[in-house]
Amino acid sequence: MVTPREDWLKLTEEETLEPELPICDPHHHLWDRPDNRYILEDLLGDTNSGHNIARTVFVEASSEYRRSGPDELKPLGETEYVHKNSGLQGNTDIIAGIVGHVDFTLGERIGEVLDMHIEAAGGKFRGIRHASARDDDSSIPAYRKPPRGLLSDAKFREGFAQLQPRGLSYDAWLFHPQILELNGLAKAFPDTPIILDHIGGPLGIGPYAGKRDEIFPMWQADMATLAENPNVVVKVGGCGMVTYGFDWHKQERPPTSQQLAERTAPYYMWCIEKFGPDRCMFESNFPVDKASYSYNVMWNAFKRMSKDFSTSERASLFHDTAARVYRLI
């Protein structure tokens, strides 16, 4: 992951568009790493940069784990840490919802661990992300290094089945060749809400570099198939990740919101067309996407590309879908 450069980001600064429009940012992280810090004060620096961020949702990032005890309980440390950093900051409900991590391959007994997360989050626990993103090519970075076919694994599904009785959702992080694997999971658990992170991970590096024209229609077809499942919603964002191959981080200056909107609209508009605004939510994915553009410019881009939607459709995209799916209001 590329570390964000604040001095570089300042080379492209813009006036905030429609600063009154309420936004729920449904995907950000917190971590304190030697080479890449993003703690509460950094998050607040972004959420206070001009847009009306009404509330946010934290998504697990393997940070602040417990250093001792059983492995399956170590992620509880992240939930505990994040809960301590949550609360009202000005007009923003920071971390109104928490998406944590458990290892579903532990099967049915993971239910007890889910109950511990729910208790540790003080009423803010909303779901689990157990990432399945992987590729056979070693040049593609894999978060958690999951095995092939994880979403079809019997033990994984045994653990996954513990979500619905607790009213919890599942955040899916995968790459575009795996979208149809999620389709199978969604059909097997039609009553469990599934949130697909970052538009399904259309890769643009390694063996996928320079093949955007070939990959895009394949991604479109698989996303259209996935959209047939009413329990699946999509986080619209994530194209600032280096793995998507847009290479904004290599430019002399960061992109403007107009440039960003033009480059990403084919992906984002396809998701909205197939899933509908009531099953799509704009996201920041900060600080990961911060390698490519600033928080203010990013939300300006979302506002530009959605300007032709109705007031109610835009309310869904910027706030209401996320607030409903994560049960924030």
Residue ranges of predicted features:
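Mid-to-C-terminal alpha-helical segments outside catalytic/metal-binding sites
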Residues: 1-22, 26, 38-46, 54-55, ...
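Active-site gating/metal-coordination segments in enzymes
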Residues: 2-11, 70-178, 184-187, 200, ...
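Catalytic pocket-lining loop regions of alpha/beta-barrel enzymes
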Residues: 4, 146-281, 292, 310
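Short, well-ordered coil/turn segments that N-cap beta-strands
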Residues: 19-22, 51-55, 91-97, 122-126, ...
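Histidine-centered catalytic micro-motifs
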Residues: 22-33, 196-199
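Conserved, mostly hydrophobic/aromatic
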Residues: 27, 56, 82, 98, ...
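Catalytic metal-binding/acid-base residues of hydrolase active sites
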Residues: 29, 62, 103, 133, ...
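Alpha-helical scaffold segments that flank or form the walls of functional sites
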Residues: 33-93
